[in-house]
Amino acid sequence: SESLFDQEADGFERYYSRQADRKKEKKPAAHQLRGNRRELGSLQTTEAEIPVEELRHQAKTYGVSMTVFLTAVYLCAIHRTMTRRQESKPVVLMVPVNLRNFFPTNTMLNFFNWIEPGYHFQGGKEEFTDVVQKVNACFKEELTAEKMEKRMNDYFALQVHPILKFAPLELKNVCINIGARTAESDVTAIFSNMGIIRMPESYETYIRY
């Protein structure tokens, strides 16, 4: 059974291992989506329903998972809005990864990282199959315990940095905002496939489908 301590434990802290500094690969700037700025705190949500069986069948015809298939579809959809000039930069998606699949934990806290599949469209010569294959190769290469551990360590190292750890909250917020803006230049959009969500039976009577 899960204890309250297990549920409140920090998965990052449990699996963090200090490593020697390694040079980070410099990532190229990604294509940025433009739109009308909305009021602070407001969101625009678009909902759609897709028959899962049909989606699964389409993914299967390419020999990939539904997540890989949908990631490729999203990349191509963004490309359709781009001009030839904008094709000078790749389209890159941030795809969250549930670290519980690699590092067992009962924590109820956030415990995820991400990978960044992308595609550099050039002149519209690419077929959808090319994009699917590139995305699938990225998933296979990045979704390993070794790669996830490195990303996790890089992320948590900031939290335990001796300067930031004891810095005032105001300074931390400034550093976080600067880091967020820098990270945004490497990514075009975020895509998250939550997959099948199973709730405890005791919650079922309170959930409406």
Task: Show which residues each predicted segment covers.
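Short amphipathic alpha-helices and their capping loops
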Residues: 1-44
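Gly/Ser/Thr-rich phosphate-binding loops and adjoining beta-strand/alpha-helix segments
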Residues: 31-100
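Generic intrinsically disordered, low-complexity segments enriched for polar/acidic and small residues
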Residues: 9-13, 66, 203-206
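Acyl-thioester-dependent acyl-group transfer interface
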Residues: 1, 47, 56, 79-209
